[in-house]
């Protein structure tokens, strides 16, 4: 194995700005062996930092070739360069570049996260490195709680985390006092003795004199490359690398993906918690949008259910036949062709379950010294089945009562309360106009389809109503109940055809509750869709807010992105981290929005509304899906911008 670790051949680096080109490195040739301690010295603007960036795979040459351990890396892509940074290099920056939200241990762990080292193993190694550097009592301290010298030692530990075969130190004493600076140089010298290849970049000859070899650079060219007076090259270390830079065992890909995801999730939570108010305001658009969608769907479901329930109170699967051409026909009162025989003939049609004739009038009902106005309806024995009424007390009359014109009545719960209070009305006699009738049954309370739930209702056999009370042979209407799964439109047409044949003309109209129900369902669905579309607009606005804040976050955390790239993060790692953060913000907003929707439902139910909001599990699931998709869609652009940052520019950003 060759002792040459890093080799540069005819390397040039130029920067182009518009029509101008600036050559920073000009045909550099350089070899650095394993175990050397090299100082690159030059004034500001000499090109020394650019050379360090190329050597550390943070930058690529414009021309020429660069070899690491015999491999030409001058044309590699960014992700391949990131892999080399993880495997070979550890960076010590003048300004430390520690991540302010992480503890000392967590900062040291960062390179190992991107190297795929399992959590437990990397934590143990980070703690061990910090202990060796005298920071065993500062493991859980954040950078703001450490002195400058302590922060620099944390950065040294981070550089050694993945082995640090080559340590690149950029002005390592520049931000330290003289005592801490001496300690840092002693530490680097110790690492050199352990076999690490140390490359110092400095303008200070006092620092450079710690190196075995001093390379002077001026105007992008190497003007001197000399050995120090007391050259001590650790030949043995070059042949046998020290245990201090043995790399931790690499994990399989699932560990790499999982730990990277967990790390990105933790960083997202830290970023959110460090800017709580901004995070909340970012979520607010998502919260309002999700709450609006879920609440609107719940309101639509609740109102639809209430309307359908009201329609059901008119009768389940019923078709009503009324005289005239339709509602509002002024001549309907003169149509006297609907008869009981028509009702009997309708019973013979297929899919017909039961039929009831009906006559109605408003009469005064009297009992003892009480009187009130009630709606009195003459109906057949099947009326209560057709309309879905249930008995509370007593019984309904039968066919014999209808045939015998029995003076029997069934009253509703409102009539019972009005006329009898707490007394049992069964067997009592009341007067309907001048006709006495005996109460045989009381129906259970039932909401009226049109909201007139306080009206008094009394039912008698239609024959009694026709023969004893009104003296008319024609009916006010016929109600037909059809089978549960019958095609209501076809049955309705059969009813029309039969009655047209019997009457010789169509002097009646029909009311199909199934048609009404379908129309209401379509109308409700359309209104729900319309209002939901408006709510979706607020979701989009919220998504734009997320994107804006994430763009701000990328700008604020540019240096953090540069540090992560320097220690080996690929573009995909940075993209994933910021994308997870955007999705997490939107998911939290979605959860809060669903919670707000339930609070709205609770307030709505306690406000005395006539119906309840009915929440749909589908709408809740879609709310989660939408919030996730919004996070991905509106978080992708900021995340991509973060991933495409140049690590050198990111590290230089203030």
Swiss-Prot record:
- Name the membrane topology term: Multi-pass membrane protein
Q: Which residues form the ABC transporter domain?
A: 6-244
| Keyword hit for Translocase | yes
Q: Name one GO biological process term.
A: response to antibiotic
Q: What is its main location?
A: membrane
Q: Which GO terms describe its molecular function?
A: ATP binding; ATP hydrolysis activity; transmembrane transporter activity
PROSITE patterns (UniProt xref): ABC_TRANSPORTER_1, ABC_TRANSPORTER_2, MACB
Known role? Part of the tripartite efflux system MacAB-TolC. MacB is a non-canonical ABC transporter that contains transmembrane domains (TMD), which form a pore in the inner membrane, and an ATP-binding domain (NBD), which is responsible for energy generation. Confers resistance against macrolides.
The record's listing under PANTHER family reads:
MACROLIDE EXPORT ATP-BINDING_PERMEASE PROTEIN MACB, MEMBRANE COMPONENT OF TRANSPORTER-RELATED
Name the UniProt record assigns to this protein: Macrolide export ATP-binding/permease protein MacB
Source organism: Vibrio parahaemolyticus serotype O3:K6 (strain RIMD 2210633)
Please spell out the taxonomic lineage of the organism that makes this protein. Answer: Bacteria, Pseudomonadati, Pseudomonadota, Gammaproteobacteria, Vibrionales
